[in-house]
Curated annotation (Swiss-Prot):
Keywords: Cell inner membrane, Cell membrane, Membrane, Transmembrane, Transmembrane helix. Its main location: membrane. Residues 302-319 have a biased composition (Polar residues). One of its GO terms (biological process) is regulation of protein targeting to membrane. This is Protein AsmA. PANTHER family: DUF748 DOMAIN-CONTAINING PROTEIN, PROTEIN ASMA. The keyword Transmembrane applies. Pfam families: AsmA. The lineage of its organism: Bacteria, Pseudomonadati, Pseudomonadota, Gammaproteobacteria, Enterobacterales. Belongs to the AsmA family. It comes from Escherichia coli (strain K12).
Length: 617
């Protein structure tokens, strides 16, 4: 045993001595020019290494360098620069003075994908033909990334497309490994901070680049992300998921399949693809088993009452995003001009502004700024909602047009969702045509226009009982009638119809008609959506709810009573002209009785005098 251990120690000493001698005999700086030339020959980039190269033996034989940079031909700034670079090399090739790099590690790297880092073609450089009819060579089908392992730590990626704003990804950690067939795996994490928003993302998956650049596929097995900051819910948005991606060079197409993502309590699945032509062509086919927009897009609008107090609807306290000065003068929706799209969305459950929709289906197309929504429908509270329309952003001034169709939708839910303090419930059906310049609740209150026909059933308006108001007014003015007791401060109608017109925040109600077992009304009026005021004029016949029988009751059943309702929605006033009707009724009754008496005494002098008096009245 002692001899065996002695022999083993001798071999170990010889091995260590040999390796040490090899490292001492091979100068890593001898490979500097070789690496620079190889990088330039294979990629066209200029590699610059600052400071001397040195060996690092444990735990992996490596070459260490100081600052390094990688610059494209003619670029004004380097594409990659790093504080340190480590090359893990194989030992045996060094015996023949060859360099075999197994892994490259960059620390403190800054990667810039900006116009300043792009290659610039010299004026005398030859121009390749647009269509290359030469057959592909086997060498053309490999991956230019010929390193088995790449590791990037504590680095930064700066991305900028043309004149757009820069996007900076910080705290990057990237680990990539591949086999000789260019199939590999990767892990990535980073953080993006922009416009007072912070996005943290991490993902891992596999990639197949055996046919790159003609075809590249990747499977994102796990992605985790969290978004926090301005214009977001207080708790932020976080989720996870997986998907598959494929790039097809011949079609310039990027496809996403088997998408499965979550965002807070919302879920998404489906597929998407984009063809990168001069104007990108998008195609989306997405399904949402659950989509809670209230938990993704908070509302900050308020509705002000007469006393100035703000009423918060479904809004949450959020930090507003800063206004970017370069975007102030941009026409609204101009981003639609830069691409085309064919979109099909389906959602089993959608929550928006506190309203719960089911079976939502959307089909729309964008043709370089002309957005056509051919289908946008769903179910709400047992009713049907359809909202097809168009958004024309091809000019400086956008034009939006919608043709809403509602069938048996609870109106109280809609009023509450948009913060209208109107105590009104009932099933509403509506068919209309509205237009404006901005899709926004506040813009609708001020600047939209259109018209619609409205029908409502089982209507209930809290705060006023028209029947009770008229009957009590008749009793107070000495009418010899008795009303049935009704202590509800509610007006109920079995059916109500009207034609409305909207212009700059003012809704004009024409040809209002309503019926119930005790009421029949007609009228017209206006609602000011911005000021939350109204002024309506009704003619009401109380056809039921009276006790007993009398000529006055018969008169009131047949005679419309003028009723004006006006003022702030939360403090309504009314004006009721019952005394004039009663006075007219007494006058007519007196005339009738005098006329009857005069007829019975027409031959007498008194009868003739009364007859003459009635003719003058």
């Amino acid at each position: 045993m002692r001899r065996f251990l002695t022999t083993l120690m001798i071999l170990l000493v010889v091995l260590v001595a040999g390796l040490s001698a090899l490292v001492l005999l091979v100068n890593p700086n001898d490979f500097r020019d070789y690496m620079v030339k190889q990088v330039a020959a294979r990629s066209g980039y200029q590699l610059q290494l600052d400071g001397p190269l040195r060996w690092h033996v444990w735990p992996q034989l490596s070459i260490l360098s100081g600052r390094m940079s990688l610059t494209a031909q003619g670029a004004s700034q380097p594409l990659v620069r790093a504080d340190n670079m480590r090359l893990d090399v194989a030992l045996l090739p060094l015996l023949s003075h060859q360099l075999s790099v197994k892994q490259v590690m960059l620390k403190g790297a800054v990667i810039q994908l900006t116009p300043q880092t792009e290659a610039v073609r010299s004026e005398d450089a030859p121009v390749a033909p647009r269509d290359n009819t030469l057959p592909d060579l086997s060498d053309d089908r490999g991956w230019s990334f010929d390193i088995s392992s790449l590791k990037v730590a504590d680095s930064v990626l700066v991305f900028q497309h043309e004149d757009d704003e820069q996007v900076t990804i910080r705290n990057i950690r990237l680990q990539m490994e591949q086999d000789p067939q260019h199939r590999g795996s990767f892990e990535f994490s980073g953080r993006v901070n922009r416009d007072q928003r912070d996005l943290t993302i991490s993902l891992n998956g596999t990639v197949d680049a055996s046919d790159y650049p003609h075809d590249l596929t990747a499977a994102i097995e796990q992605i985790n992300w969290q978004l926090q900051g301005a214009d977001l819910p207080k708790q932020g948005i976080q989720g996870q998921g997986s998907f598959q991606a494929q790039w097809q060079e011949s079609h310039k197409r990027l496809s996403f399949n088997q998408i499965s993502l979550t965002a807070n309590d919302s879920t998404l699945s489906g597929q998407a693809q984009v063809t990168l032509t001069e104007k990108p062509e998008w195609q989306l086919r997405l399904q949402f088993p659950q989509l809670n927009l209230d938990n993704l897009i908070p509302l900050n609008e308020t509705a002000n009452g007469e006393n100035g107090a703000a009423q918060q609807g479904q809004s949450q306290s959020t930090l507003p995003r800063p206004v970017i000065s370069s975007r102030i003068d941009e026409p609204a929706y101009q981003g639609l001009q830069g691409f085309t799209a064919d979109i099909l969305l389906q959602a089993s459950n959608v929550r928006w502004r506190g309203m719960n929709f089911t079976d939502v289906a959307t089909q729309m197309t964008n043709k370089s700024g002309l957005l056509e929504i051919t289908q946008l429908q769903g179910k709400l509270n047992g009713g049907q909602v359809s909202l097809p329309g168009t958004l024309d952003a091809t000019s400086i001034n956008p034009r939006i047009n919608f043709q809403p169709r509602l069938e048996n939708v609870e109106i109280g839910t809609i009023l509450k969702a948009f913060n209208y303090p109107i105590s009104l419930t009932g099933k509403m059906s509506l068919a209309g045509d509205f237009s404006g310049a901005d899709i926004d609740a506040d813009a609708f209150r001020h600047n939209w226009q259109g018209q619609a026909h409205v029908e409502m059933t089982d209507t209930r308006m809290e705060g006023m009982n028209f029947q009770q108001m008229i009957q009590q007014a008749v009793e107070r003015n000495g009418g010899d009638v008795k009303a049935a007791e009704n202590f509800d401060n509610v007006t109920r109608l079995d059916r109500f119809t009207t034609d409305l017109t909207l212009k700059d925040g003012v809704v004009t109600l024409n040809d209002m008609q309503g019926q119930s077992p005790v009421l029949a009304l007609t009228g017209e009026g206006m609602l000011n959506l911005a000021d939350q005021t109204c002024d309506t004029q009704f003619d009401i016949r109380v056809v039921g709810g009276w006790n007993g029988e009398s000529k006055l009751i018969d008169f009131l059943k047949e005679t419309p009573v003028p009723l004006r309702v006006y003022g702030n929605w939360q403090q309504l006033n009314y004006s009721l002209q019952v005394d004039q009707l009663l006075r007219k009724h007494l006058q007519d009754e007196a005339k009738r009785r005098l006329n009857d008496w005069a007829e019975r005494n027409k031959d007498s002098r008194n009868g003739k005098d009364v007859k003459k008096l009635l003719e003058k009245m």
